[in-house]
C-alpha cells in the first residue's frame, strides 16, 4: 500500500520479477478477474549484474484484460504439432512495445 504525501490517495502495488532478456512475467488465472482502479503491477526485469533493472508500471485492469485475451488466443491456436493446448492456470503478461516502461506517472501520486 502506497499513498501520496498528503495521504489523500492510496494505491496497492504488486511487484513481480523476472530475469532475462524478455519482458515477460508469469501470473495466475485469478489475476484475470480481479479489477481495482487503485491497484497496479510493477513488473521488474532483472538484467545482468552490471545493468540496472527495468520497471514496467501497469494498471491492474490492463494486466487482467491482456492475460485474459492472450490466454484465450493461445488456447485457440494449435501447438507445434497441430494439437490443441490444454487449459491451465498459468498466464503471462508481456509488454512487447515497452509502453509501460518507467510509467511511474500512471500511479497518480
Where are these regions (language model features)?
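Mixed-charge (Asp/Glu-Lys/Arg
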Residues: 2-109
Amino acid at each position: 500500500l502506497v499513498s501520496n504525501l498528503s495521504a489523500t490517495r492510496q494505491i496497492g502495488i504488486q511487484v513481480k520479477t523476472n530475469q532475462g532478456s524478455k519482458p515477460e512475467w508469469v501470473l495466475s488465472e485469478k489475476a484475470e478477474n480481479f479489477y481495482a482502479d487503485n491497484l497496479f503491477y510493477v513488473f521488474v526485469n532483472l538484467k545482468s549484474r552490471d545493468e540496472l533493472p527495468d520497471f514496467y508500471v501497469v494498471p491492474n485492469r490492463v494486466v487482467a484484460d491482456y492475460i485474459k485475451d492472450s490466454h484465450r488466443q493461445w488456447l485457440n491456436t494449435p501447438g507445434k504439432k497441430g494439437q490443441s493446448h490444454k487449459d491451465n492456470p498459468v498466464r503471462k503478461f508481456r509488454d512487447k512495445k515497452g509502453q509501460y516502461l518507467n510509467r511511474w506517472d500512471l500511479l497518480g501520486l
